[in-house]
Amino acid sequence: MKKLLIILMVLTAAGFTGCPHTINTTKESKLTDKTYSIDGINFVMKAIHSVRDGMLGADNQSDNKKHTVSLSAYRIGETEVTQELWKKVMKANPSYFSDKPFKGEIQRKRPVDKVSWYECIAFCNELTKKTDGLGEANCVYYSDPAFKKIYTKEDAKSTARVFQNMDKKGFRLPTEAEWEWAAKGGAKTKWAGTDKPSDLKNYAWYTKNSKNITHEVRKKEPNGYGLYDMSGNVEEWVWDGYNEKLPESGEQDPIGDLYSQTRAVRGGHITKESEECECAHRHDSAPGTKGYLRGFRLACRP
């Protein structure tokens, strides 16, 4: 009896440690991946369950030390947004890498690049409008704080201020915390999919294997959540205003610095060294810039 009591005490204590807890409500138990189609172009959004006290950051990152966050359930793009999807929605392909794909790869399935943060915002709304089951009523981004005026392509051209309504279920940019949690893939690995430098070539296109060009998505191994290219190919815009100091541990669904003049960028790219491809690595860029090594991936509420 005494031995049983000790075991029960140990198990009870274990339930109150700092380990992350996936919150599986009845509703979330039905949360699954979802495939969308826009005029024959399919893309997959992977389901990520909510988490309490999930560990992000790393000790070797000066602007992203270890800290915990709690996140509501969400979906995130299996891949970076491709050139074919961007062109279908926006009627043009702005990419620097718009021709001469690597041998055997399909040009239209390379990630879109050379897009500003504002243009990504407009794209998310345009895609939401075109998606069956969503439509304009589910657009996330607005040009006014009362959420009356849908953010448009014209707003993006004028770099108008963006207001985000996270209660909407349309497509959007992931937050930094959502992006990093997804990149880790349910593990504690340094890169998306692996903790071994020698294995990084199997998961990411970066300086040692890219030949300085972007590549068709889904050509490398996925991470634990079934996501591709989160440590390489193109780096990715996220929603958050950048601040060198992240919020204290314990925040629920953090969205970044509302007054920052720059936006956070995540993930490695084809000319980055391995250190800059780590899941916890972060930097920033002015939202109006159009880097030829920068794209994005989608997120949405389930």
Language model regions located:
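Sec-dependent N-terminal signal peptides
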Residues: 4-12
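GGW-centered surface loops in extracellular recognition modules
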Residues: 25-47, 162, 168-171
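Short acidic-hydrophobic surface loop/beta-edge motif
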Residues: 32-39, 46, 52-60, 67-69
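Conserved beta-strand positions that form and line the central face of beta-propeller blades
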Residues: 47, 96, 111, 190, ...
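Active-site microenvironments of metalloenzymes and redox enzymes
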Residues: 55-57, 70-196, 202, 240-244, ...
